[in-house]
């Protein structure tokens, strides 16, 4: 799909580390993501082998590949070709046939075929400024069936303006000292300075305005949030 000239370039907002083959090769070890909790949530919401799931911002495919045995098909979408190359290596090694990798993003992925049952996104929406978050959420709603589920997990600030300095400093103080084992203070500072995490009290009205009912909300440590949303 040709995008209007006034659309932002998602590749420019992807984060340079996600386009760096060296970083991507160590991404799974650094992020240490366990998909079990989120997969359990979706299965309790009814995810089964008749369903199609779209994973937006799929990265190296940790969640997509874990979800594949429980779905008819998984569409793993990411703007980074380096991430998708890593995903494909893992898919081939694990012998998984029902995961399709697609280069694209929240604004550029065009879903073809029937509306899907589930959309999943983890730690990706924050790469977009708030205006474009709304565009992205509206596009997600358009690809979901009525009653379909969006499970969104991201860095979302669930605190009041007067608490900004205290909570951000506390978060930074807990950063990893080893860049191979976790996110360092410098990397977390870059997130705050250059990426677009928003407040929960801004994101939640966006979800509602884009046609979702928020059925469950979880906040962890004032920085991380998860939303279960059903398309109206």
Explain the meaning of each model-derived region.
Residues 123-124:
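Short catalytic micro-motifs in class I SAM-dependent methyltransferases
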Residues 216-232:
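Core SAM-dependent methyltransferase catalytic element
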Residues 2-59:
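Conserved class I S-adenosyl-L-methionine
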Residues 134-146:
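A short glycine-rich, Lys/Arg-flanked "PGG" loop and its adjoining helix->strand segment in the class I
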Residues 153-209:
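C-terminal alpha-helical "lid/dimerization" subdomain adjacent to the S-adenosyl-L-methionine
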């Amino acid at each position: 799909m040709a995008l209007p000239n006034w659309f932002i370039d998602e590749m420019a907002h992807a984060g340079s580390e996600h386009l760096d083959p060296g970083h991507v090769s160590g991404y799974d070890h650094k992020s240490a993501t366990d998909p079990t909790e989120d997969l359990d949530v979706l299965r309790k919401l009814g995810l089964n082998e008749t369903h199609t799931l779209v994973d937006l911002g799929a990265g190296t495919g940790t969640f997509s590949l874990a979800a594949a045995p429980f779905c008819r098909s998984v569409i793993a979408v990411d703007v980074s070709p380096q991430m998708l190359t890593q995903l494909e290596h893992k898919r081939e090694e694990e012998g998984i046939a029902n995961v399709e990798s697609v280069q694209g993003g929240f604004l550029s992925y065009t879903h073809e075929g029937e509306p899907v049952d589930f959309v999943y996104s983890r730690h990706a929406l924050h790469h977009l400024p708030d205006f474009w978050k709304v565009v992205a959420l509206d596009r997600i709603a358009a690809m979901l069936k009525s009653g379909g589920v969006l499970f969104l997990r991201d860095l979302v600030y669930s605190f009041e303006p007067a608490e900004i300095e205290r909570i951000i400093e506390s978060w930074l103080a807990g950063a990893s000292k080893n860049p191979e084992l976790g996110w360092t203070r410098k990397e977390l500072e870059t997130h705050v300075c250059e990426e677009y995490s928003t407040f929960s009290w801004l994101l939640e009205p966006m979800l509602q305005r884009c046609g979702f009912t928020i059925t469950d909300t979880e906040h962890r440590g004032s920085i991380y949030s998860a939303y279960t949303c059903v398309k109206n």
